[in-house]
Amino acid sequence: MSSHRAEEIEASDTCTVARPADGKSAGRADASVPISPPRLGMRLWSAGLGRLLEIAPFLTTLVLLSVYPMLRYLLRDPFPAEVFRFGFISFWIGFLIVNMVRAQKTRQAILHAMEVDWLGRLRGLQAPLSHYAIFIPLKNETNRHVLYRTFRSVERLQYPKSLVTLIPIIEAEDRVTLEKLDEVVRQVAGRMQVEVFSYPTDRVPVKCKATSISTCGRWLTARIANGDFAGGPGGIRVLIIDADTLLHPQDLAFREYTHREEEAQAAARGVRGVVLQSLTTYTANYWKVPMLPRLHNTGFVLYQMGKMQSRGDYLVLGPGTSMDVGLFEAVDYFEPNRHNEDMQFRYKVVMEGYRVAPLKIPTWGQAPLSTQDSWGQIARWARGAVDAKFIVAYRQRFRDRRLPIANSKPVQALRALLANAMPPLTVLLPAQLILISWISPCVRDVWPTPVFLSPDVLALKHAGRSLCVSTMAVFNLVFQTIVLTSSTLLGMVVVPYTLKPIIYQRPPRRWRRGRTFLEWFRLVFTPINLHNYFLMATAQLYTQGKLALGLPITHTPVTRK
């Protein structure tokens, strides 16, 4: 078992980043470590900008959610409001259909990738294979079975055992996790290469997964430089997964093949390098909780699969990130912070001139969650989904390169703000349109029978005039009803077909028949999951609101039990 003394890290509670004070960091100002400026004006400007950037995500969401009510009730002419309504409904259904079409293409590619012998193909090409160092940061892991299944998935990889080293990363003070880890390591001893990396945290102010990964990355880099870590013929790559991640047997071989293809294309396009991110989905091992609603099993996975067909960078949350060890060192590892370090790493990579490319093969998370735990899990995902403050404050390392406009900091910051606002927007704005339309007098014009709480009673009027003054308002009500109903029916047919073979592994034999029926039933009747989408939207608003009010959002509930 290796042990490594953590380097001194400087940070404050208001920072998003804590960085080691080593020689390599010299000459580069930290992304948000406060450096006392000589003048009071500069200090006030820095503090004010920081608070504005913390408020910006919440403000962006509120502004976008208030556009339609303001257009409808503040203007004398309701026509602009109806144009906005028609445009958003068209965008909403168009986005859904495009994602479904793209997801179908991704589905075919994923199913194909899971069946091909990629190692045999690499050997047929006589391609030199890379040595993969698989980082698994551990924190408060009390379920030995979850750890064992993760280790077993690594053991089953169809890749030379000598070129796979599993490196669990653990804080020296985390005795409970260390005890569980020792039990699992003893079980797999002799069957795979495992090097446990333990480091003390007495001088580490920001104790998080990013700190663990960065500390281990520097330790591994030093070992490589000293010749203590043998590389493969194709070099050394780092793969980062979570403690509950299951890898497909073809993962490393397909990853190596994809790395070579993407890097060849990157060189032709003038990109510095490539980071791969695999599709994040979930297994059927949460069969213990029948009919369990999981947000990621429908909308989020569908969105991920759609994004895999885009030409842009694949900035999606999840384990399964891999890159060359030299690239990992060049971008100075992860950024320890109180938000989501995965997303900060990906944004940093893009701004430094690298590409984040999708790996069209799934990694499965195996943790069962109760409905109560879902709030903590979704709030944890929402917490840093995007950190515009990090993007604005970050200072690039490679300033001598001319990057595309799409990779620039202003564009990435705007992208971050919009991405942060999209979950509440796509859930709450359709609900807002429905509610407002049902208190409109237009309902009387298109509904054949009187409805509960007559529109004449609930209708809001402006200067004595009805708000339903155009045929477009009537058309929008019909159009909205048809679109939202058809999207539900479309989801009942397409989503189960698209996701079921990718999300689920086989449940235990004694549960197989009943579980198959329950899973299909839950996926087909997608309205059952509507409350989960509202849970996602409110969790995002809750997190943004705490950040805007200056309240701490550091705490991450441990949901993997």
Q: What is each model feature region?
A:
Residues 150-163:
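Short, acidic, metal-binding catalytic loop of nucleotide-sugar glycosyltransferases
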